[in-house]
Amino acid sequence: MSSLLAADLMPPGPGTLSDLVPAMGQALTGGGPAGLGLPDATRYVFLLVDGMGQENLEHFRHLAPTLSEMKNCHDLTCYVPSTTATSLSCIGTGAVPGCHGVVGYTFRAPSGRVMNALSWVNGDDPEVIQPHPTAFESLVAAGVTVSSIGPARFQRSGLTRASLRGPRFIPIRDEDDVDERVYKTLKASRSGDASLTYVYERSLDHVGHGEGWQSAAWRSRLMWVDELVGALLDELDPGTALVVTADHGMVDIPDDHRVMVEDEGGLLADVALLAGEPRFRHIYTRRPDEVAQRWRRVLGDRAQVVIGDDAVAADLFGPVDVSTRSRFGDVLAITRGDWAI
């Protein structure tokens, strides 16, 4: 494990996104104190801010005083690839990518096609892609009232059905309305003696992808998120714990650091399918050694190129089920710095 990770990658743990819901569940079900150093509570509100990585927040902490001054802060790592579909699946299932099988923004589905895990284009049945009970479903079965608050269009999305199923879904009509979100969160939190209310906030990530995380628009949205957190802290009932985290951070990519595979030295030779995302490519091929050698030669120090079997052996994705192995690339290209492919 160490030889692969030492080059560029941080090993997951000791606390990961996969551990978060089970950590709250320990207190909610009476199985023991909350894990990960979280406070014990009978009600948790769990706010997931898409795209608000630790380094991004630290850079603009002066714009988010409420977030910056929250107590009991702990570092969590996300498994690779650090992308929304994979990280939300880790959170919702309480499992690692090698188990839940949502291994990127796009990846090779069991059907053999490249599927998009956010839009679910070319996706197989969500319950087939991810058949295991989710962490939310396990809490519901244990008698915990679990609610999910987010945009209405996500209620029956493929990703929700695969990895976030189980909670009662409460749609948000106006994503910019702090009062609506706080009101619905309070109502959901009070709906059971033991409750977990999951609140998904996506706009910071949306702005970051469109404008960049150092843009004025991103900074403005971070201030809005901080306002939302402050409003929740002001209104939540005593004994209710607010847990805030992100699913990944963001890196701005300069135009001249975007590698176009069609224009670079035969990178597509012997490649059957190319999936993943610009910072973490799954490359599917019957000739992994030759393809990896070619990609290393062309990309140089712009990316770390590894054989998929080596990454699996290094436990990069956690233990990998036989049923999910074919979804990971035969070769992986993991960009360095601010490069993208």
PLM regions and their residue ranges:
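Feature captures the catalytic ectodomains and active-site-proximal regions of enzymes
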Residues: 1-341
